[in-house]
Amino acid sequence: MPRATGNFEVTLNPLDNNPGIEGLGRMSIDKQYHGELEATGQGQMLTGGTTIKNSAGYVAIERVTGSLKGRKGSFILQHNGIMTRGTGSLVITIIPDSGTDQLDGLRGTMSIRIEGGKHFYDLTYTLGTA
């Protein structure tokens, strides 16, 4: 499977929360991807925290618009993250059939790592009808 790698910057901003629902939050996502994916990402994240330190979860939907190895278009990522007392897992999937223009038929997954405060992505994908 082809891969695309690079780094990104992310800005999260709180949005209006559901009044009266303790432990839940909502944020906007704004990203700038660099490397083999040159794009912007915009979306929303829902979070849930617990009274136990470092235990939480989030889901997010993000539209990515730009170019993937020179192919222009957009696609949608679905994030599902969970942290259990500091041990985390994250699954980020390209929503099937969300690719547009030259990214029509894009499918795959993205992983994220943070090193020295900097964010990196690794996108594994296929392109074409399935």
Which residues make up each language-model segment?
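Targeting-peptide/extracellular-domain and disordered-appendage signature
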Residues: 1-130
